[in-house]
Amino acid sequence: FCGNVTYGNSTTEELKARGHKISFIHFDNPSSSNSSKPLFLANDPDVSLPYLIKSQVYTIPSPRAEKELRLSLERLKPDIVHASLTLSPLDFRLPELCNEINVPLIGTFHPPFDAKNRNLTASTQQLTYQLYAPSLAKFDKIIIFSEPQKNVLEKLGVPKEKQIIIPNGVNENIWKPFCEKNKKYDQVKNKLGNER
């Protein structure tokens, strides 16, 4: 799994464990993708949105995905929508869709961030931030992962009061540094060296 999938699954499971009713809307083509029927069942909290291209970097939704998303949100009537932003054109439509059905929208902005790099990767990251900033400013809240990231988004027009920093964006009780040193740890460390 990529980080987005792990993040989505762990967030969903944690909310379910706390007694919240969760619906999961994600990109996944059903076997009969040419069908014009809705991609959900009446009582099913999970919805599959059709796509044309899907990778770990971006997703191109099918032409009917936006309609499916709107119908799903109207049917599910959520109290709140959380979007794990996946570099998809639908990310930019979410603020308007949620506003139309009067549902608060929170997003987690996953694109990588490195304030120090000055290379092609950093330029691509900067372009992604510039493209997303106007849309992120329309979300009710945006989850990000660091203070430097917050500063960049604020400079690009995303109000600081809409940004919430969750370091690493993970459950720190599960994902934490290994602290118990033992013989196997020392063997691995000796093989890899102290810089790793």
Segments (PLM) and residue ranges:
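N-terminal subdomain of nucleotide-sugar transferases
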Residues: F1-S31, I101-V103
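Carbohydrate-associated surface elements
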Residues: D28, P148, G169
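A short, charged, and often flexible helix/loop element on the N-terminal side
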Residues: S36-L71, A83, T124
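An aromatic- and histidine-rich active-site surface loop
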Residues: I80-V103, G107-D114
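A short helix->loop->beta-strand "cap" motif at the edges of active sites that frequently abuts
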Residues: I101-L105, F139, K160-K162
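Nucleotide-sugar donor phosphate/pyrophosphate-binding loop at the beta->alpha transition
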Residues: P104-I106, D114-K138, E180
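A short beta-strand/loop micro-motif in the catalytic core of glycosyltransferases
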Residues: K138-S146, I164
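A short helix/loop element that forms part of the nucleotide-sugar donor recognition site in Leloir-type
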Residues: K176-G193
